A protein has these predicted regions:
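Domain-level signature for proteins that mediate thiol-based redox and metal-cofactor handling
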Residues: 1-109
């Protein structure tokens, strides 16, 4: 996949995540690095539930279900007032090993 396809794929995963998680959790891809590291900002009331890490891991699971290796490598809890409704997820994506085609990027769960 080209860099443009990576970003398109991540945008589709972001949109699907937000559709599935509604108002409780919202994801926004904020950084994509050449080595496959992807930084995603998560906001919402999910931060007050148990299993906070699971909410972040769902982002990776949506990618895996579409043929791209992905895993959460770090969850960052911001300090200060933002901590109540925000978490940062650092993911590792392996786009190079995927066999995904452009037509496979969309789709609802």
């Amino acid at each position: 996949m080209t860099s443009e396809k990576y970003r398109f794929f991540l945008k589709k995963i972001e949109e699907l995540y937000n559709k599935l998680h509604g108002v409780e959790a919202r994801a926004k891809v904020v950084e994509v690095k050449d080595d496959g590291t992807v930084v995603v900002e998560f906001t919402g009331t999910f931060c007050h539930t148990c299993g906070v890490r699971d909410w972040l891991e769902d982002f990776a699971y949506l990618a895996v279900a579409r043929g791209v290796e992905a895993r959460l490598v770090e969850m960052i809890e911001p300090e200060g007032e933002e901590i109540d409704y925000k978490r940062i997820g650092v993911f590792k994506f392996n786009f190079e090993s995927s066999q995904i085609e452009s037509g496979d990027l969309g789709g609802d769960e």
